[in-house]
Structure formats: structure tokens, C-alpha cells
Amino acid sequence: MENAMETKHSNRARSRKGALRGAVLAGALMALVGCQTSPAATTSSNTGGTNMQLQLTQEWDKTFPLSAKVEHRKVTFANRYGITLAADLYLPKNRGGDRLPAIVIGGPFGAVKEQSSGLYAQTMAERGFVTLAFDPSYTGESGGQPRNVASPDINTEDFSAAVDFISLLPEVNRERIGVIGICGWGGMALNAVAVDKRVKAVVTSTMYDMTRVMSKGYNDSVTLEQRTRTLEQLGQQRWKDAESGTPAYQPPYNELKGGEAQFLVDYHDYYMTPRGYHPRAVNSGNAWTMTTPLSFMNMPILTYIKEISPRPILLIHGERAHSRYFSETAYAAAAEPKELLIVPGASHVDLYDRLDRIPFDRIAGFFDEHL
């Protein structure tokens, strides 16, 4: 399959106009979704003065079967803001006594570690890497209040906190750390790696730049008037939340009413069917807070993408993905060494879990070469 991939290197980037126009800013988020080892079931998390107990499941509740080739552990670790994150650690069973390269994995935006990131983590562990799939702050089994809120700053920090944790494991060579970001966490991964020089290589799969789509809409179609109106509405919502003492939430995601764009149908097919449904996922019929877009509106996370160089970037996207332009723009903005790999015929969601579409051989080869 990988010989059929369309790979783009410097001076060969191809621009592509998106088919989606006129997305209003307030709807951009809704359109998108459509560690210390702890054997105990709970662990304390001090999150902004709120002492939470993380309720960690002990049964296998992933959307994919457990591989006989890996060892799995539930773990927790704290980020720099004192939020305790829950994660799944995967180790190759035939690892021997050598310290191994490691990969930290996050995403998609609104998903949990039991979904796509866990599948990537387990598959890469089968190929000889120690891997960690984590729930971002405020979501899944991780700590933080209020629930289901996102932040480009805190969620970027989540990646570096995961690097902190995995680097201290006795099975890991801390000089050989990589990162994979999926969907909206692809942009977060690039932002984290730009500032975190401990990471030696980064891969994004079916990437979104969440700050771009929330501030400008799909294909940058939002006007200044629309943006201003949205910010005014979000400001009014802040007053309502302050008056009630609790945040309001958007309508449940990925419930189809008919007439939706194909990519929204694709989201539903993953998040709301047995294929990928998970009750803790924001995208599986839950929702983000109404004011979640605020922190994304004026904080462009790819500003310093050039500073990832001289460490290599591999950007992977589906040929038919509505989001393809995010990877193409990131590729154009990044410095060498960089590679854009287009998967023929693949949609955005295909790269969440379709083993016949995700180029795991290429991903493993990339990290084998650069870690």
C-alpha cells in the first residue's frame, strides 16, 4: 500500500481549495467533532483547588482488541498546571533488557485514549516502541474542572507532561522520544514539539489546526463581521455562566438530522456506532462547553512551526479528507526536514482506525530512522 502513497517533499507542495465554504465561527467547533504507574482504581488530582478522585477503569474497554504482543498498564501523571492525566502505557512483550525508543500519542480532538490514539499506541508498541496514549486535561478519565473544556495552552502542555512521564520509565531511552498527534491534536503536537526540544521527531495524522478553524472557519471563510459577532455572543455566554455558577454546554455532537456534509456523516459513523463509540468521548454524543472556542480565537498554535527544524516532521493526510488543507499549509510553513504523505482515496476519519489506510509501516520506519 505504501508504495502507492503520494509523498510530497520541499518545492513540491500542491495547493488545494477546500469544498466547504461559509462556516460560521460559532459552529466551527461543532462541525469539527462530529505518570506514575498506579495499580489502584483511584488517584487524587488537585486541579485548581478542586480535589478530584480519578476513577480509572480496570477492565479492557477500548474500541479495539488487546494485542497478545504487548503489555498494557493504566498510569497517571501530572502536568505543569497540577492536573492529573490518565493514560494507557503499551510495552512490547519481547522487549528484552534494552532501553527502547518511546512515542507519546494524543487525539483526535474530542476523543479518548480508548479510541484512535490507543489503537496507534498499541500498533506502534507491536513494532518495538514504548508508547503512551493519554486523555487530555478535562476529558476522559483525566482530571480537571469543568469537564469537557479544551485549551491550546494546557493541551499543548499535556504532550510535554506525557514526555516527562515516559522519559523516566526504566524501559525507555529518554534521548529517543517521538510524538504522534491525530486530528486536532496534530496541531497541538506540532506546537508542543516546537517548544519541547527533548522530542526528536513528530508525526501528525489527519491533522487539524484547531486555532485556525475556530478563529477563521473552514477554509478561512469567516468574515471579520462574523468573527466579531461570535466573540460578542461568547462574551454574553460568559456572563450567563458566571451568573449560574456552572458552564453551559453545546448540543450533543454527531447526532445526525439529515442533510449534513459527508465529513459529518463520517464522524457519526466513527463516534456513534460500535466502530468507535466510547461513552467518555466528547464526540460520542457529549459536548464541549459553550465557551471552549474562546481560548482558540487569538492563539495561533503553528506560529513557531519552523522551530521544529532540524528535527523531522511527517504529515499524513487522506486524499479525500475535507481537512487536507491543514496539513498542506503546515507543510508549506515548516522548515526542512519535512514530508507530506497523502494516502490515496482516504477520508479524514479513515485515518482514525482503518488499518488498511493508516501507513503504519511508514510511521514505524520514520521513527526507526529518526529516534
Swiss-Prot record:
Name the Pfam families for this protein.
Peptidase_S15 (PF02129), RMMBL (PF07521)
Which terms does the record give in the GO molecular function aspect?
hydrolase activity
* SUPFAM superfamilies from the UniProt entry: alpha/beta-Hydrolases (SSF53474)
What family name appears in the similarity comment? To E.coli YcjY.
Q: What is this protein called?
A: Uncharacterized protein PA2218
Q: Which organism is it from?
A: Pseudomonas aeruginosa (strain ATCC 15692 / DSM 22644 / CIP 104116 / JCM 14847 / LMG 12228 / 1C / PRS 101 / PAO1)
